[in-house]
Amino acid sequence: MPRRRISLPTRTVEATPIEVPKSLQKKAKPVKDMDTIIAQAKAMSEKYAGQYDCVTDKDVLIDYVDTIISEKRTGLDTETTGLNIFKDPVVGFSLYAPGRKAIYVPMLHLSRFTGKVDPNQLPVEFCAQQLNRLNGVPGMTIDYFNAPFDMNELWYSMGVKLWDICSNDASLMMRLLNTERHRNNNLKDLHAEFCSHTTRGPRFGELFPPGTFNRCPFKYTSAYGARDAEMASELVDYAYGELRKPENAGLLQVWETIERPLIPVLLRMREKGVLVDEAKRAEFIVKYRGLKEAAEADVVHEYEPYIPKINQWRMRFGRTKGKIIDMPVKIGSDGQLKILLYDIMGLPRPESGKVDKHALKEINHPISAAILRYREAAKMLSTYLEGLDKFLHADGTVHGGIKQLGADTGRTSAVDPNMQNIPSHNREIRTMYIARPGRYLISCDYSGQEPRLTASLSRDAKMIETYQKGQDLYSMIAAVAFNTTYEECLEKRPNGELYLEGKERRGQAKTIVLGICYGRQIPSIAEQLKCSVDEAQLIYDKVTKNFPGLLRAQDESAQMAHDKGYVETLWGRRRHLSIMMHDPYEFRYKDGCNPDFDPFDPEGFSDSNELSEAAKKKYLGDLMSLKWRKDKNEYIQGLVAQGIEVKDYSYQISEQSRKCLNARIQGSAADMSKLAMIEIDKDERLKKLDCYLLLMIHDEVICECPIENHKEAITYIKEDMEKVASQLPVPFKSDPETAPCWYGQEVDIEEDGELEDDGDGDGEEV
């Protein structure tokens, strides 16, 4: 439990003493192997003896904070009992002031003798007062590794809100520098490789199993804790050194204008939270339980005739590993489903041999359709309905987190709960997220964000002109592809009636454009268009001939990746695709096989496995001239027989080449959406209206606003969203909707208080 009950979303720092959590007031239960854990911590402490300080004296902490204020910079890290920012308290924190030893400040470590909080530590309230002194210091910066976690923990556990101080997050900075290399690395790994150039130290989990850190004497844990703050600052210095190189000017701009300013924006969004309609949630739980049970009954109905075979199988194999099947069959077990579908029912086994969504659709049998329905209902229940219990706060709100770099493209992702992944055909579930009493939710997303970005990246004159005229791009492309007028390719007639033929033509044009953006081959496009390959090729050729910028953007993106190992967005963000720098095939002699290698020439050792450039060029040319995989494999085997190793990158290059243009589009969309959030968050006009951000779902921002202010707020939100792309050649539009709940009946902003159904859209690009 947290030390003091928080009241979200209007929490303010209170003057009342911060209590020790009840869970830490009780005598701790014994932990197995605690002696071993303490011995390991002691050994580490002795290794770094004299390099770090453990501070348990108030005057020493005051003096240290004075130094930080004077230097206007510190590294900061927290140590907690767990990863739940709302429940797991900070037991100690570390600071690193330039020119001084890093320190660890213990607060809630347990005594080995009493099992209760050791009294020989600094009080939480006093520590909070000292940390809060950093607020308001002009030019102050704090270095973190995973800033959102530490900043949230300090706030919800200690009442210390450092959100308005300039924050450097080494984790984000290193991820920006290389989206491939630093995706999963942690502080210890990165610091060892780029700063200390030594073998990394032990990670937290390697030294301290869950729930044991604050059970170790703080004199032994201080070195571990203090080092984290020091390493975070040193890694920030390294990252800035890289970002400030001339060739990385675009990345530096992304950090300083997008990622760093976004950190406190996302914290404020999580703090506000969104209200859940419990009555509607209960209604959906009943509905989806019924759907799950019905789907399960359908599955049983389909395999019922095979029960004798199932029983024979069970008699034959019993509990043999890999052969187990229960009765009734466990629908949630992939292993049992494989046995049921492929071994017992004899359904055609897909090439993958799996029972995932794609495989089940390929099987195309009533039982596979029922399994898919079962899984979807189960997913809705476990993730978005029943599973919401663990995220609900006492006031009926959920405070989900947002991973700032949730994807390599720069897109955010939602966690705890993941509200981004609610399927569009189950969007009714979104209606259980509601505005607080007396308020509306304002949802605003970009109209055709990705095709507009495609036009900007392609610099195609016709595409740009289409948008500048306020026309629909896909309809214009469809008119060219099908030799008809623009009006015949719109989804609706001038009177508002749905025009099915126009909608179909527009949809086919959209398929072609997206096919180019996603690097799809003609057969794949033909399959989506439901036409022959020849017909798809004709349409494709006509579109690319009339809109040459599409293929130009595709080629330029692939060439950029080949030359640099990454592609860039319109704002300078990078998506690394390093395989693109390789040749499709690379050659080298096996050890000792180079006929020109002279063992008595010391300068020749480095090239002992290298082929001549002429040989490489010949072999590569030969392989590229072969059309069929079988012929390529035979050629490669011939080289292997000569002692030449061949590395085949062709498949990986093919895969990554399809991502090049799409990565630039998706990354540019991420940049735009993040800039929009920053603009909305800092807009003083919206603050005066008490309108604030709640959620970001892909390119859709969701704000909450008092009912009486919603018209004015919409004007400012649209303005903020559209101006972030004002430097691009294509105008961007945003479409606002106002409702009492997410995806509810839209409020007509022309007439106060009246509701009208927003329908399924107006034919704009998605």
Regions found by a protein language model. Give the residues of each.
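Acidic beta-strand-to-loop metal/phosphate-binding motif
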Residues: 75, 139-150, 441-443
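Nucleic-acid-processing active sites and adjacent nucleic-acid-binding tracks
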Residues: 98-142
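Conserved beta-strand -> loop -> alpha-helix junction used to position metal-binding or nucleic-acid-contacting
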Residues: 161-179, 186-189, 470-474
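Conserved pre-motif C helix in the palm subdomain of viral-like polymerases
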Residues: 227-234, 658-681
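Short, amphipathic alpha-helical "recognition" segments used to contact nucleic acids or chromatin
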Residues: 507-518
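C-terminal structured "cap/appendage" subdomains that terminate the fold
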Residues: 683-738
